[in-house]
């Protein structure tokens, strides 16, 4: 569609109805979705792209209105705030918000919102009503406060926050989530009862909740190259270590030693006694499906248990917790290489003044 040649125009685009999705696409998690209980519209899926139209000083000033069932709350991804401007007799509500871009991302669903003050920020925490019992049992709001207070004090502010506010949005997202412009996504799969009972991530549901939230710093705030599947260096090492430190601060050294360090050590001891670790040729001879299952289990131990032990040893070698905090704060706030923005194991070793051999656990 060609636009008028006037210097300034007001462009209104209306569309509605309930589009039909490919049956296979509709069951895939992540990406654009329109259903009776959840909505995700991204960029051109939300508003057609403007071509050959330069932005003004304030970008592309845009007002977006959307009418949805009254049970659904609208959450723009970013700093924009959506407000209800009309309620219809057919059980729908019209929401409106302003933006400075022609696209953007919009989420909507039957969300519960909790407002939390932590780390010098006002946090809007959104999660699905169907997860309410699980989230309350896990102490989700308390976990958010603990993590944000601790990580902000020890590592620094999240680069994708506005400084004053942050939206944490539970969503159907693939790849662990993403963050920008004062908002961050949390994968709803991380907050199921099954995941929250994973003892490899914490001593209970509340501690697993802490683990998943720490990924806002180690995983989103700082990214890790996951291309080498054999590497024990990943976002999990620093995330598990940070969870241990938070738990140690909350429940004391004895609890943290029993539920974290001792369990890491037991898992690592068992790893090096494992038949397939000692006889890798036998592992390679297995059928692919069985080989992958065993390899994934072994990699889990290395990333979630062995790496935290190495970080703990590094902590002792550099002079204790305060020294390690200074090192991690420096790494978290380092100047990134735009061509390779990942935090590497060598970066960590260099910051500690250590070598790989220094952190051998034998």
Give the location of each predicted region.
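Acidic/His/Gly-enriched intrinsically disordered linker/tail segments
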Residues: 236-309, 317, 336-338
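Juxtacatalytic substrate-recognition/specificity segment
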Residues: 64, 115-231, 242
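Active-site rim elements
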Residues: 48-55, 131-138, 226-229, 294-301, ...
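Extracellular Ig-like/FN3 beta-sandwich strand-entry sites
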Residues: 6-8
């Amino acid at each position: 569609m060609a636009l008028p040649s006037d210097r300034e125009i007001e462009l209104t685009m209306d569309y509605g109805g309930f589009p039909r999705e490919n049956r296979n696409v509709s069951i895939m998690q992540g990406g654009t979705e329109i259903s009776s209980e959840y909505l995700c519209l991204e960029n051109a899926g939300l508003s057609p792209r403007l071509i050959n139209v330069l932005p003004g000083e304030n970008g592309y000033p845009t007002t977006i209105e959307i009418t949805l069932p009254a049970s659904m709350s609208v959450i723009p991804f970013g700093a924009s705030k959506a407000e209800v401007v009309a309620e219809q007799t057919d059980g729908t509500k019209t929401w409106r918000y302003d933006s400075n871009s022609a696209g953007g991302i919009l989420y909507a669903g039957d969300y519960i919102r909790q407002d939390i003050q932590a780390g010098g920020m006002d946090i809007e925490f959104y999660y699905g009503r169907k997860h309410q019992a699980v989230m309350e049992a896990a102490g989700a709001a308390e976990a958010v406060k603990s993590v944000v207070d601790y990580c902000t004090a020890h590592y620094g502010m999240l680069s994708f926050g506005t400084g004053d506010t942050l939206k944490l949005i539970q969503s159907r997202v693939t790849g662990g989530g993403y963050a920008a412009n004062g908002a961050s996504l949390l994968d709803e799969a991380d907050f199921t009862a099954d995941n929250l009972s994973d003892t490899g991530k914490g001593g209970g549901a509340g501690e697993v909740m802490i683990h998943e939230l720490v990924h806002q710093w180690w995983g989103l705030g700082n990214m890790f190259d996951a291309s080498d599947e054999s590497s024990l260096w990943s976002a999990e090492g620093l995330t598990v270590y940070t969870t241990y430190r938070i738990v140690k601060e909350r429940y004391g050294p004895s609890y943290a030693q029993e539920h974290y360090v001792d369990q890491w050590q037991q898992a690592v001891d068992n790893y090096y006694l494992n038949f397939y670790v000692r006889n890798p040729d036998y592992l390679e001879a297995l059928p692919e499906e069985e080989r992958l299952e065993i390899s994934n289990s072994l990699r889990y131990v290395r990333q979630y248990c062995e790496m935290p032990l190495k970080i703990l040893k590094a902590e002792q070698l550099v002079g204790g917790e305060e020294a390690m905090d200074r090192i991690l704060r420096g790494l978290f706030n380092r100047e990134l290489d735009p061509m390779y923005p990942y935090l590497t194991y060598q970066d960590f070793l260099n910051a500690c003044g250590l070598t790989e051999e220094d952190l051998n656990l034998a």
